[in-house]
Amino acid sequence: MSSPVASKSVASTAVRPVRVIRLNPADDVVIALDQLMSGTVLDEEAVTVSGLIPPGHKVATRDVGEGEAVHRYGQIMGFASQPIRAGQHVHTHNLAMGEFARDYAFSQGVRATVPSTESATFRGIVREDGRVATRNYIGILTSVNCSATVARAISDYFRRDIHPEALAAFPNVDGVVALTHGSGCAIDSEGDGLAILQRTLGGYACHPNFAGVLVIGLGCETNQISRLLETQGLREHDRLRTFTIQDTGGTTLTIAKGIELVRQMLPDANDVKRETVSASHLTIGLQCGGSDGYSGVTANPVLGAAVDLLVRRGGTAILSETPEIYGAEHLLTRRAVTPQVGQKLVDRIRWWEAYAQRQGAQINNNPSAGNKAGGLTTVLEKSLGGIAKAGSTNLVEVYEYAQPVKARGLVFMDTPGYDPVSATGQVAGGANLICFTTGRGSAYGCAPSPSVKLATNTALWQRQSDDMDLNCGEVLEGSTTIEQLGAVLFQLLLDVASGKRSRSEQHGYGQNEFVPWQISAIM
């Protein structure tokens, strides 16, 4: 996606520049960069604004009849629920979701990915099996919520802000983190819910960003640790230790045992060094949350440009949040390397349609109050902008939630749209870095994989600068292009992968953002 160009006009009521963006010649709307007052004339569109248009919101540039399709990005983003006049605000009061045929055109847009002649590297930690870590944590996982408190007590003992002496001799260890959850029992022992939980825990237990892992249970839970290890092909060893509260003799003894086991792991965990490795060892989870009308104009395409640079150097990017590509999936199926890969994506879309129907929900309920306040109206519009995170390379594989990602290039993982749940699945699949775009303002952070956050607009950057790592609002201001800022972001991702701490890491985020997807009934 090339950089948008802001068309400038002069208002009829005052001599001042009026900034709007037309994203595609076929669009029926332009996007306001500033608040537009009623009576403002958009000269290049030959339109006079009627009513107040907030920044990031849409202005109709032609009359649209009731039931007609309305286009943004050159694609259908919804249908007029009432007649829309040129110059009017286009939003929830006059634009709605609607069904329409999508041409999946499986694999018809596949293009050869030309490897870059310019190498890219970062300073990573090479594990014994050849995988590369971007961070070096000791993790404490729980098989069930019942062991969450003891897990947290063990990790708190090693917190540098509480007991700085505990890790003073181990500067190469990034920390000891407890990743707890609210499930693990009173669910179907043969159901999908337990399988997903075990797949998620298994992915974290063997994640390269962990130098060692404890798995703690209560003892009588449905999610038995022995079965967890068996289903995930894991075995206990010096860097993966398991035990239960019931077998250990209660809370106090369990906490003491956990602290002692972590102490035993620390010397080996600290005995690492970073070395220069290829960017092909990066697997980046792509996220967006608190999206606004600028997300698909700035931060998402900037991330997409960085993804293209990564993929051309042999790296991997994981696009996810299935409800947030809904209605735009045909843009990905065209890029699927085979029709079979494209059909996998369509199958996940159909699963979500059935899942939403069973729950008495509608996928179009996905846009949040914040999304709508920021200018997004339908899930179609949100999806069209969200797909921009994926850049322009081929879609090489589709995975279910938390499955190990083994393919190189752009892949898709089926996840909900809720950011912590989605990112948890990506990290379980092997993501060693997360990149997160936001327009309304997110404070998300992740452990053990660091999260880099991009602001879609300068107002957010200024308002919430201590949570943001890059300001993509510069694209709107014309001081840079999507391609240029994408290159800046790519270097930032390499720097963070090399050990530079992201904003969320500086604030200590990550322990509470581990949220496995729960789809089972709780009995």
Model-derived regions, located:
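Metallocofactor- and cofactor-centric catalytic cores in central/energy metabolism, strongly enriched
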Residues: S2-L433, T437-M523
